[in-house]
Amino acid sequence: MKSHSLSIVAVLLTLTSALPQILPICIVGAGPAGLTAAKKLEDKGRKVVIFERQVTVGGKCQAVYADNTFHPLGALLFSNASYPETLKVIATSGSGGVTQAPAITSTFSTLVGHEFQRYAQYWTTIFAPYSALRYKDGVPQELTVTTSQWLARNNFQALPVLFVQAMVAFGYGDRREVPILYMLQYLTPDILGFFAFFHGVELIDFHKVWVDWTKKSITGPIYLGSTITKIDRLGPLPVIIYKKSDQYGHEPILPQTQVCSSVILAFPPTIPALQAAKVVLTPAETTVFSPLRLIPYFSGAVRLQVPRNLGFSAASPPNIPVAATGAPVSLLTLFNTSNIATTWSWGNNSTTTPVALQLLKDTLSKINKDPRDPAVVGKPVIDKDILGFQQNDYFPHFGPQELAGGWYEKFNKLQGAKNTYYASGLNGFETVEFAIRAGIEIVEAFF
């Protein structure tokens, strides 16, 4: 009898230890981080299940298709020198980019030139050793200050103009608030060189890239249009309770259940986002994620009566960001075959999507004309002119106080707790390249 009992215990222990290999790893979010984590896991022979609330993959990489071309609502640019992992994804997808070369302003380039060299030297010798994902090597005090403070301390006079251009229109906030750590991660000497008009970058349809790449790269199920009603981590294994829409967008009456060996949360882990998934947070998770900041960032595709290949930016002193009211800060008609402009707006924590949309229409109505003819009155922009408008929970980051308080060390200690892992722009920076790296690194480090 004793021998029989021991045999049962042995079998149970064997089954328990085998569960992580039998059960799938559940990934919440089918953006660049979640998709590349899934690919890396499948390469290791692990099963995956992906949950995505949108009806298509790509995360923030969405687009509107009209006039026989794409109009990006998310990421649109990449650089061969600074985006090595992105290049691999693009190659697999079979898509190609179009070079966007800026108009070179020789006077400004000369002004920036000597400061650029100092910046590149600092980036290589001081910042690069601390640039690892999840900032595992620590964050020196000098990298926790705001971007404005860092620029002033290093006596940069021309670079603030480039930083404003690189930050505001692309959703990265106010240099007077955002720590320099993140801007150095973003603005490699190569990327800063683009904003200094030294060279061009590549423009590509990232939504198509991810759709095509996913078809070729991932074999596990992807539950698009799914609503997670609870992520239960109270037991030994995480359980995701969800409702998955059918092909007509109808959700089932009864929720479905997926038991997971682990969960990778591939979205910005803000407290509201975690609470929306009904995650019961631990005290440590509440401490780490409560001060997490986002930039309220909106993107649109609007049909306008402006000349082709024309851009507008909100007026402000060149080294001072425009106010974050929710109004558009920049627009650009990317193709001379279309009169659809891509727009970018940024707001504050009280800016709602309806408010930002109304500000978009009001602002663009004033400039919806040919600016070369001062007698022409702007044509009102109405709902049918707006082909797409997207609100983005953008650029998750910690503030100077948290960075100085060792918040990334606290964040890294959460990885794996309750079989939960985090992969998003918070791990490095909010770009396609760093999202890809975040997904890969989490798998390489913990699986």
Name these PLM-found stretches:
Residues L187-S262:
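Helical element adjacent to the flavin cofactor pocket in flavoenzyme catalytic cores
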Residues I22-I50:
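N-terminal Rossmann-like FAD-binding beta1-loop-alpha1 element of flavoenzymes
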Residues E42-Y65:
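Glycine-rich FAD pyrophosphate-binding loop
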Residues S261-S262, I271-Y421, F429-E433, R437:
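C-terminal segments that line or cap access tunnels to active or ligand-binding sites in enzymes
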Residues L87-V178:
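Mobile amphipathic helical/loop "lid" adjacent to a hydrophobic cofactor/ligand pocket
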Residues A435-F447:
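Internal hydrophobic alpha-helix adjacent to the cofactor/substrate pocket in enzyme cavities
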Residues A63-T86:
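N-terminal glycine-rich dinucleotide-binding loop that anchors FAD/FMN and/or NAD(P) in oxidoreductases
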Residues M1-P20:
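Fungal secretory targeting signals
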